[in-house]
Swiss-Prot record:
Belongs to the RuvA family. The RuvA-RuvB-RuvC complex processes Holliday junction (HJ) DNA during genetic recombination and DNA repair, while the RuvA-RuvB complex plays an important role in the rescue of blocked DNA replication forks via replication fork reversal (RFR). RuvA specifically binds to HJ cruciform DNA, conferring on it an open structure. The RuvB hexamer acts as an ATP-dependent pump, pulling dsDNA into and through the RuvAB complex. HJ branch migration allows RuvC to scan DNA until it finds its consensus sequence, where it cleaves and resolves the cruciform DNA. It comes from Clostridium perfringens (strain 13 / Type A). One of its GO terms (biological process) is DNA repair. This is Holliday junction branch migration complex subunit RuvA. Residues 65-143 are annotated as: Domain II. GO terms for molecular function: ATP binding; four-way junction DNA binding; four-way junction helicase activity. Residues 153-201 are annotated as: Domain III. Residues 1-64 are annotated as: Domain I. Signal peptide: none annotated. Gene3D superfamilies: 5' to 3' exonuclease, C-terminal subdomain, DNA helicase RuvA subunit, C-terminal domain, Nucleic acid-binding proteins. Residues 144-152 are annotated as: Flexible linker.
Length: 201
């Protein structure tokens, strides 16, 4: 079992990042929040890990904070919520805002996550509401639940940009390489424009 990995950030894809350690590139699935906290390519990063093993799959899931890792594991404890759904939930807002939504029974916020329907949202609220501590959140953090979090669409924007570049005839590898050098806080349109400038050099 792995506790964490410390290595060089080497790239980002639709739902994972690549971390190099001792000349080995590790594919680590993660959330939009963690993706938004990645440093420049080549810089060092530390991710807290959870390994998932099934008959047909072995995968590493990593996060920049222990808090997000613990929330990921808590979500996995719910029947019907797998790793993909948990990452989707952790990509729509900060961990604190997600906790606040659960404690307040805010189904609307939770169903913003792709792949999360009303019944699943209700199950999440029912099973986790009493496990979360209200005193861990400030009123300011709670108020943010009504707004748009800066990272809420981060993962979605990356996916859309990659898809657009591939639709223009570039391979996934080419698109990813260009996108690694582009500011991920830009809009989809501007990320595409900046990526194309790099690809057409």
């Amino acid at each position: 079992m792995y506790e964490y990995i410390r290595g060089q950030f080497q790239g980002i894809s639709k739902d994972y990042v690549v971390i190099e350690l001792n000349n080995i590139g590790y594919k680590i699935f993660t959330s939009g929040n963690t993706m938004s906290n990645m440093p420049k390519v080549g810089d060092e990063v530390l991710l807290y890990l959870e390994q998932i093993v099934r008959e047909d799959f072995i995968g590493l899931y990593g996060f920049t904070t222990r808090e997000e890792l613990e929330m990921f594991k808590l979500l996995l404890s719910i029947n019907g919520v797998g790793a993909k759904a948990a990452l989707s939930l952790l990509s729509i807002s900060t961990v604190n805002n997600l906790k606040y939504a659960i404690m307040m029974g805010d189904e609307k916020h939770i169903t913003r996550a792709p792949g999360i329907g009303k019944k699943t949202a209700q199950r999440i609220i029912l099973e986790l509401k009493d496990k979360l501590k209200p005193d861990e959140l400030t009123s300011e953090e709670g108020q943010l639940i009504e707004g748009i979090n800066d990272n809420s669409d981060y993962s979605f924007n990356i996916n859309e940009t990659l898809s657009a570049l591939m639709a223009l005839g570039y391979t996934e590898k080419e698109a990813q390489k260009a996108l690694e050098k582009v500011d991920k806080t830009l809009s989809i349109e501007n990320m595409i424009k900046e990526s194309l400038k790099l690809l057409m050099r």
